[in-house]
Amino acid sequence: MRPFGELEAAIMEVVWSAPEPITIREIKDQLPQQPERAYTTVQTVVDILYRKGWLGRARDGKAHRYAPSRSRDDYTAGLLGEALTTTTDRTGALLRLVGTMDAAEVAALRAALDAATADRRSPAP
């Protein structure tokens, strides 16, 4: 998975932060003012994100409203997964990552690992 470009990332941050589906005009208005971006530029990048599956859309009169199809966590997990493909020692890389986590993060990871292990042990219905 390739990381978002600068404008893709800025648009996704706006959409992820929006409490409800948002129009292209609303996205453009919430982007940082510098550099100034043309409406059509924002529209093109929003359409690219829609075609990539990151945004969903619904018609609202003459406009579309956009909402995230995938979460920030999905994006981060994809980047981490991609990073792990670049090493021959995935375990070592994961252990170094765990070494940077605080106690609450380690506890959450431990709970997720315990749940995943329990799911694998449970016979399928």
Please give the residue ranges for each predicted region.
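Short capping segments at the starts of secondary-structure elements
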Residues: 17-23, 36
